Amino acid sequence: MDFLGSTTGSGTLAMLFSFSESILPLDSRSFLLKPLFLRWLSGFLHSVLLLVLFFSWVRKKIRGDSGVTESLKDRRDFGFKSALFCSLALSLLNLVLMSLSGFYWYESGWLDNEQLVSSLGFLLGMVSWGVLSICLHRCRDCEHKKAPFLLRLWLVFYLVVSCYSLVVDFVMYERRETVPVHLLVFDIVAFIAAVFLGYVAVLKKDRSNSNGVLEEPLLNGGDSRVGGDDSVELNKTNGSGEATPYSRAGILSLLTFSWMSPLIDIGNKKTLDLEDVPQLHDTDSVVGLAPKFRSMLESPDGGERSGVTTFKLIKALYFTAQWEILVTAFFAFIYTVASYVGPALIDTFVQYLNGRRQYNHEGYVLVITFFAAKIVECLSQRHWFFRLQKVGIRMRSALVAMIYEKGLTLSCQSKQGRTSGEIINFMTVDAERIGNFSWYMHDPWMVLLQVGLALWILYRNLGLASIAALVATIIVMLINFPFGRMQERFQEKLMEAKDSRMKSTSEILRNMRILKLQGWEMKFLSKIFDLRKSEEGWLKKYVYNSAVISFVFWGAPTLVSVSTFGACILLGIPLESGKILSALATFRILQEPIYNLPDTISMIVQTKVSLDRLASYLCLDNLQPDIVERLPKGSSDVAVEVINSTLSWDVSSSNPTLKDINFKVFPGMKVAVCGTVGSGKSSLLSSLLGEVPKVSGSLKVCGTKAYVAQSPWIQSGKIEDNILFGKPMERERYDKVLEACSLSKDLEILSFGDQTVIGERGINLSGGQKQRIQIARALYQDADIYLFDDPFSAVDAHTGSHLFKEVLLGLLCSKSVIYVTHQVEFLPAADLILVMKDGRISQAGKYNDILNSGTDFMELIGAHQEALAVVDSVDANSVSEKSALGQENVIVKDAIAVDEKLESQDLKNDKLESVEPQRQIIQEEEREKGSVALDVYWKYITLAYGGALVPFILLGQVLFQLLQIGSNYWMAWATPVSEDVQAPVKLSTLMIVYVALAFGSSLCILLRATLLVTAGYKTATELFHKMHHCIFRSPMSFFDSTPSGRIMSRASTDQSAVDLELPYQFGSVAITVIQLIGIIGVMSQVSWLVFLVFIPVVAASIWYQRYYIAAARELSRLVGVCKAPLIQHFSETISGATTIRSFSQEFRFRSDNMRLSDGYSRPKFYTAGAMEWLCFRLDMLSSLTFVFSLVFLVSIPTGVIDPSLAGLAVTYGLSLNTLQAWLIWTLCNLENKIISVERILQYASVPSEPPLVIESNRPEQSWPSRGEVEIRDLQVRYAPHMPLVLRGITCTFKGGLRTGIVGRTGSGKSTLIQTLFRIVEPSAGEIRIDGVNILTIGLHDLRLRLSIIPQDPTMFEGTMRSNLDPLEEYTDDQIWEALDKCQLGDEVRKKEQKLDSSVSENGDNWSMGQRQLVCLGRVLLKRSKILVLDEATASVDTATDNLIQKTLREHFSDCTVITIAHRISSVIDSDMVLLLSNGIIEEYDTPVRLLEDKSSSFSKLVAEYTSRSSSSFD
């Protein structure tokens, strides 16, 4: 670019010298005071600047300077930014004056030498200041404190010339000579800019430590990094280590987007992966953006961001991308002006072809002008679009970082009004929408500029008839407004409906296991379909309204042209073909702002709504930093001190959660907290973490803390990473922690040990394993204070004892520990026991001290003694009941036989598994590679009505194109070239035919638009139903191995693309192809030689498109793949915010979020760059085609071609480059968007579970009547690549008996239950219930006949009624009866809305114990013959456990009850006990017989439990 600029400058200098020679004979003194000399001097000076910049650039390239030779300067330096702004302003001002001079030429000819010299001077000024601006921008990160010597010298000369210009203006004013106002303004502005630039370049002090080596920092373009190593490291996501080539590209590479070529070349050689995509530059990375954005949101007094307003948010976003926004405004202005050059010159071109020539070589000058305008239009549009997308990426990244940061600090009260789905929507919807607003940010002022330029051209050609054009334009805009308003309302309602659907979908996906166990999945699918139906109602209104707007868009030029030409006839203004063609070309350009204005207004409103939502979210209260006074370790002799504290989750409530709390914990103390369900135990721990708002009192914590939550929070990722939790690996300590938490054996069983990847929410781990991993996480932190919220409830008795001994009394013997527990046996070891009741500490002291001092503690002890009495009675009666066990001997013998048989079988299995390939259960998201299969396109096109509408859509567009070309052809042919030529038809005939053709074309476009949205709507609906039906029918293994973020991404982002974008993408391709064929047809009518150029140009375009699409397609896929981890990380962070804060890990998680955010932004950034790389090349090719046609037209003799038809060809040719680029762009965009269909079809073909109902083999209505479960040689594995979990189990559960299943965590207990419900299908063997093989009947026939109380109590958002009876099968009386039986009736009656009392997301407004009682209520309603309890009482106290056991014994006495429990008291009174170990039966007999054998594992377990519990009363 510099080379071209310099050559132009030299040639212009020669021309200027030739003019000066003709002028020099004038009186020298008079000559020096003439404006002509000033413009000549200015042009010469700017030529010198271009030469200096060019030779500096060449010198740098030859020397290979790295560019960074001096220390960096603060990038916020006022002088640098202002210098950049001044350079841009001067370039823009020169452009405006050059344009004015240029248009003057065509009015008055080339005879005025002063005008010519002035115009050339302005041209050189525009180019030189523009190049200087680019150089300044390229070195914005590495500029020196002073400009290079040559540049400073040049600026001094420029200042002198500017002063001289003002002196000349003053002298001319004194002589009463006329000074053009625009030149006077230019001289004043230039002088002010020169003074400032001179100050910045010459007088500003150099604050660097270097000696000012004479280098050219403006041209170095070196890459620099700001922020230190940490920020750089943070920015490096999983990918190429090098920074973006964009930051290191030279000027020519920047202009042509050649910096994208290496990546596109890699994409052609191999399938692109994220590792191939270079890093973002610091200015585009969230690492660099977030601090600046945060500082802009800070209050002026440095306070919290509680005062965030919409205006402050807008201001912060603006300053985050201030430079890019200004540059895009500059390019938008240049593009708008350049796009109107063609229409302005068409009349002159037609007159030239008609023989009316004003000077020699006028035709070639016109061709050069057309070509130059096209080049400027192309360059400005490409860089405008690219930088707009950069702005969008920056805004989105900054907002996501701030939303995430707010989510980490939100108070629990603030969270209550917002579900996690809504908070995630701020990131996935609102932040994206604000980022997309960058496309529309310049439209408001551009509309005024475009309409102004159009009216100016129309006035030059048609005089006062341009007023009619203005009126028609305003009418069309006004017609668009009501449709725009409706579109806005429809979209708002559509988004609300989508939010509701996504919220419900998210909840269902989280709880899919319980839905399948209960047989409710199809009921909840119908709920999703109902929500989608509501969404489809608004979608239909939206798309049909879009069809009307599309009709207005395509019909607008017709209406405006009919009005304008009609006004010409009424006013008697002669219609000449050149003027008409100029007007038609102007109308076509005016079409865009007319169409975009409603969209722009709608987008502004939507963005305002999103900004308001985000501002209100950022204004929510954070956690109070002063709830807990945090003291450094060793600064106090008290570890925890709580004095007269009253705390409440709801500060406005009259009944605080915790009241008058007082206690002290000294270093090394063990404090136990106990109490009934809902007494405030967990709230007490939360208050020490600073989570519960404080009403009064004081809390002090001295030292670091670690927290173990009641509900395990496990991150997706490796087990090792979950335990280390940001700490460096210390192998010795790590091994000790694993041993203390009994994790070593579990890791040995897992194929990948501690490198096993945990699924979402620890889906592939048992409850006990999750609990022990989070205990290990806490231990590894080596904190001073440990807070354990019921850590032993989810593990078996043996493991619980081991944990208590090795963890609390072992590794933590010297630490302060506060632990909540329901197990009384763990209380005596405590130094202090706090008994909670109704939010108060009712008793406090050591075990023996408070044993007889109050009733609350005695109630807990009494419940425990009652449970222990059951164990003792079974043990005592074991001998007397031998004779009653004869009927069980067969079962015992079977079990023994199985054990013998399994010894050899285990060996076989081990060998088999060692050969089988094993993979992680959670795999990287599968993405298609290579080009999108044609089958995907075909399926999309034919899904709606078998593709029957497609031919009619194409026919409508073809007819529209023919009628539109016909109407323009008619106007060109039927109007004279000039006033002295007779018109071939009457004016009335002219308008009647034109109106008829225009009306016909409008009807065709209305037909096409309506059919297109109809087909698109139908296809979107079909794809939605197909995908969701397949997902809900897929086996549980699919959900275990597929993070919900991947499904959510398809249900939201991909579905939105199918709903709203794909129909228009397909339509755009068809429309553009037909338009392009029409243009080629028109141009070939004038010049068949166009084909000689057009054929190779088309071939080159197709080659470029194929070369580009390989990389672009994979980049687009990577965008989709990289979005899911960002959403998933966000979702996990919100659910685990308390744990993250308790470990003080906020910074690390923010860093991870930034890394994932940049990982998502990188492929988006390069997708934008690749698109502009392609469009630039296609624009150049089509511009060459257009110029070839023009050269041909001006080269042939006058009269050979009808000037009117030639003008028509030029009119259509003006849009050739736009259409050709648009065609390739839409093709590429279509292939990128069709990936959404590909991804949806990917999940629409997921293998389904076996049938829900098999009509030919349905069990009897009374089945199962006895409830006998027979298991034969059962083998189970979770996936073909996973090891066996159950390895040949054979046993029988007799009908009507209670069977307890025990075993270490991970022994296969829960797997056995899942197999009974066919959540997991057996690899071998069978299960029979009352003689019916469950594999031969439908899933719903099986699952709806069984009942289960799951390990994790689940409640859905809705009401108490909908949670107890989701299938709506029972009356209110039956529901109340069930609630009373499970002891929840009184609690629900207290609520104002009774059965319609609200249940929040995940049932968070009900305690864990209450949720478990709701699950008990469900099975009481269902009354199945077989009931399974999967560790159902793990989260409740002993008294509540006893209550549940009593209820079950009372109401399920004749049923088969299968109980998995960690509490011995829950299974000791069972009729049979099955003990599993590593997937095989270790023991299976009656509790009495097993207790007789003191060497049995069960006997040892009971003995340990009894001795441990009995010690509580010693």
Swiss-Prot record:
It catalyses: ATP + H2O + xenobioticSide 1 = ADP + phosphate + xenobioticSide 2. Residues 640-863, 1271-1503 form the ABC transporter domain. It comes from the Eukaryota. GO terms for cellular component: apoplast; plant-type vacuole; plasmodesma; vacuolar membrane; vacuole. The keyword Ribonucleoprotein does not apply. Ubiquitous. It is a multi-pass membrane protein. InterPro entries: AAA+_ATPase, ABC1_TM_dom, ABC1_TM_sf, ABC_transporter-like_ATP-bd, ABC_transporter-like_CS, ABC_transporter_C-like, ABCC_6TM_D1, ABCC_6TM_D2. GO terms for molecular function: ABC-type glutathione S-conjugate transporter activity; ABC-type xenobiotic transporter activity; ATP binding; ATP hydrolysis activity; ATPase-coupled transmembrane transporter activity; chlorophyll catabolite transmembrane transporter activity. ATP 2 binds at residues 1303-1310. ATP 1 binds at residues 675-682. The chain crosses the membrane at residues 35-55, 83-103, 116-136, 153-173, 183-203, 325-345, 364-386, 439-459, 463-483, 551-571, 940-960, 987-1007, 1077-1097, 1181-1201, 1205-1225. Induction: By 1-chloro-2,4-dinitrobenzene (CDNB), primisulfuron (PS), aminotriazole, benoxacor, oxabetrinil and IRL 1803, and, to a lower extent, by cloquintocet, fenchlorazol and fluorazol. PROSITE patterns: ABC_TM1F, ABC_TRANSPORTER_1, ABC_TRANSPORTER_2. Pfam families: ABC_membrane, ABC_tran. The keyword Coiled coil does not apply. Glutathione-conjugate transport is inhibited by decyl-glutathione and, to a lower extent, by GS-GS, but not by GSH. All transports are inhibited by vanadate. Pump for glutathione S-conjugates. Mediates the transport of glutathione conjugates such as chlorodinitrobenzene-GS (DNB-GS), and of chlorophyll catabolites such as Bn-NCC-1. Also transports heavy metals such as cadmium (Cd). Belongs to the ABC transporter superfamily. ABCC family. Conjugate transporter (TC 3.A.1.208) subfamily. This is ABC transporter C family member 3. It comes from Arabidopsis thaliana (Mouse-ear cress). The gene is ABCC3.
